Amino acid sequence: MLLKKAAERDWKPAGPEGVERSLFRNNDTGGRSSVVRLKQGARVPRHAHHGNEEVVVLEGIVTIGGVEMREGDYLYTEAGEEHDVVGVTDAVIFVSSQKATPAVE
């Protein structure tokens, strides 16, 4: 069993300015589960994953691949599906990917 308390999250910069990640775990196939925090206007460039990815919006509004998502919305992407992520407002999302993420843009 692995437990990560919200109060104990360790936020680290995650590439683009205004994007931070709190890692829950890395898996054996190179994927990971984490919470990502985006400032309004922050953008994760277009990319794809070698495996499937699941996203749940916990707070705020984001667009992923041009689709607007709000608190409670869920998105599943297949391996190889390209998308970017933009913080329409300050936002927090849960992201779980099966495999590593190669950059596209």
What are these regions (language model features)?
Residues 1-30:
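A short, N-terminal "cap"/entry segment at the start of jelly-roll beta-barrel domains
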Residues 19, 79-104:
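Ligand-binding loop in jelly-roll beta-barrel domains
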Residues 40, 49-64:
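Glycine- and acidic-residue-biased ligand/ion/polar-headgroup-sensing regions
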Residues 31-35, 55, 91-92:
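Structural motif
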Residues 64-84:
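Short acidic-glycine-tyrosine-enriched beta hairpin
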Residues 25-26, 34-36, 45-49, 66-67, ...:
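Short histidine-centered beta-strand/loop micro-motifs
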